[in-house]
Every structure is written in structure tokens, then in C-alpha cells.
């Protein structure tokens, strides 16, 4: 198995892409240290893994918790792999509507946490002779209008950070790459606007419809689609690949795009309209 004897750290592991990737690493032989702010879902993942996955509640916006997480990975004999994946929809405002606090929260979660994960994992990996880091960016890093402003800017930052870190860390035999998901069936959209129950089901149907219209491959992606790309980039099969990214978007970035009419809401606004009135 590709990851036998490896210690893989996965943030945002309690659901969606992170959960699928933690399971993929475990299935291929790794010992996985799963991190998430959701302690209930994270521990449930670990409890069902036959000991292959261990969970540590982690708020990646707090540097000391990132340090503690990687310290636990070191105690296990790692880290060999770091998947910086924790995230959420973030501030939904347009550029002329943003506020400083919301902007900072989005950057802390989506960009600063990735930088700090790399910063604190790199010395540990270097002492082991190398490692692999994969960061979750987004197709929104490449085009305006694909997602809210702050989210898109943060993900563009992750993409450039990936390149800079790859150049800096190659001397330590540490590879750094990114995955750029397109429309993936996770809770990130509905959670961003606080949807539950019937409204969440409606939101899932809306996202599925957008995915079918927006991409040459006429379906939204699955978390497992991203996990497969992450596993490849983290493996020795990608030993000569660093400083780049893989688009996992069903052709969204190259094919005919779904575009909202300027007089109708964007995706997040459409989802927000499903939420019950306060």
C-alpha cells in the first residue's frame, strides 16, 4: 500500500473532502491524525476506523492548536503528509460591502491557517528527510465571480503560497502542491448560510443542478474525487511534482460555464434565500 508506515495529518477531517481524504489515506495504509473543530463528528470518524484514524479537536485559526496537532503527529513518528484542508464559505460580501472583522476571520481560516500549518510542519518533515504537503485551494482562485470576494482572494493566496513554499522547501525534500475543487457535494455551501433540514435538501438540489449545468462532466464532484487527487500528490507516484496544482472541477475551468444573470442572485445569495427568516 502506498502509505504504509506513513503518518498523515488531515485538517477539516470531520466531513466532506477532509473526511474522504482521511479515509483514503487510512485505506492505503497510513496512520491518520484527523483534526477538526467539530469534536463529535471527528471522534465518530476515528471510532469507526479500526484504529487507523486518531482524532484531535483543533481550531486552525489558533496557532498554538496547530502546533499541538503537529506535536502529536511528531509523537506518532510523523508527520510525513500534511493536508491543509480546513475551511468554510467565509464572508459572503462583495468588495464594496466587506467589513474588516469578517475579512480577517475568512483570511485566518482559509489562508493564515495554511501558512502556519506549513511553517510548523516543515521543520518536523525536514528532520525526517522530507514529506508532502497538499493544500486545498479552489477553482475560485482562478476566476472572478466563482465565489464570494474574500473566499476567492484567500484561495488565490493559498495557490500562490503553495508555489512559494514549494520553492523554499524543495531543499528539504518537501513537496508542496494544491488541489482546486470545483462544485463538490459537501456541506460548505449550505453551512455557510446556516441551512438545515428541508432547506438543506433544497440547497443540495440547487448545487447539484448548478454542477450539472456548469461543467462538461455533467455532475457535481464527490469528496472522493478530491481525495483521489490528494492521495496522488501525497504519494511517491508524484515524487517529481511540486509547486503546482490539480484542477478537480469536471472541466468547469475549460468548458462552457454556468453564469448567473446579473439581475439574479449568485449561488450564495440563492442559497441564503432558502434560509428561514430571522
Residue ranges and their predicted role:
Residues 123, 167-171, 239:
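Alpha-helical segment proximal to the catalytic Tyr-Lys
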Residues 92, 231, 242-278:
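Short C-terminal tail/terminal secondary-structure segment
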Residues 180-195, 254:
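Short, flexible catalytic-loop segment of classical short-chain dehydrogenase/reductase
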Residues 138:
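Residue(s) in the substrate-gating loop at a strand-loop-helix junction
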Residues 93-95, 99-104, 211:
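Substrate-binding pocket helix/loop in short-chain dehydrogenase/reductase
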Residues 2, 118, 219-248, 253:
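C-terminal substrate-recognition "lid" of short-chain dehydrogenase/reductases
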Residues 118, 154, 162:
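Active-site helix of classical SDR
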Amino acid at each position: 500500500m502506498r502509505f504504509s508506515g506513513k503518518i498523515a495529518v488531515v485538517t477539516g477531517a470531520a466531513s466532506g473532502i477532509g473526511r474522504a481524504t482521511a479515509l483514503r489515506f487510512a485505506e492505503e495504509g497510513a496512520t491518520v491524525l484527523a483534526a477538526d473543530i467539530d469534536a463529535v463528528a471527528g471522534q465518530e470518524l476515528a471510532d469507526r476506523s479500526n484504529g487507523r484514524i486518531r482524532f484531535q479537536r483543533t481550531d486552525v485559526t489558533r496557532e498554538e492548536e496547530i502546533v499541538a496537532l503537529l506535536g502529536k503527529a511528531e509523537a506518532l513518528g510523523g508527520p510525513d503528509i500534511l493536508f491543509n484542508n480546513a475551511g468554510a464559505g467565509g464572508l459572503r460580501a462583495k468588495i464594496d460591502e466587506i467589513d474588516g472583522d469578517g475579512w480577517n476571520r475568512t483570511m485566518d481560516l482559509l489562508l493564515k491557517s495554511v501558512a502556519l500549518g506549513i511553517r510548523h510542519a516543515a521543520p518536523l518533515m525536514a528532520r525526517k528527510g522530507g514529506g508532502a504537503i497538499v493544500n486545498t485551494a479552489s477553482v475560485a482562485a482562478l476566476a472572478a465571480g466563482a465565489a464570494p470576494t474574500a473566499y476567492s482572494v484567500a484561495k488565490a493566496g493559498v495557490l500562490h503560497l503553495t508555489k512559494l513554499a514549494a520553492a523554499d522547501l524543495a531543499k528539504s525534500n518537501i513537496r508542496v502542491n494544491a488541489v482546486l475543487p470545483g462544485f463538490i457535494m459537501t456541506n460548505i455551501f449550505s453551512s455557510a448560510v446556516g441551512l438545515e433540514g428541508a432547506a438543506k435538501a433544497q440547497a443540495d438540489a440547487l448545487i447539484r443542478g448548478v454542477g450539472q449545468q456548469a461543467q462538461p462532466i455533467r455532475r457535481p464532484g464527490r469528496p472522493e474525487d478530491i481525495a483521489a487527487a490528494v492521495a496522488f500528490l501525497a504519494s511517491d507516484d508524484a515524487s517529481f511534482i511540486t509547486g503546482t496544482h490539480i484542477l478537480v472541477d469536471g472541466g468547469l475551468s475549460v468548458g462552457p460555464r454556468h453564469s448567473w444573470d446579473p439581475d439574479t442572485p449568485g449561488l450564495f445569495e440563492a442559497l441564503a434565500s432558502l434560509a428561514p427568516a430571522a
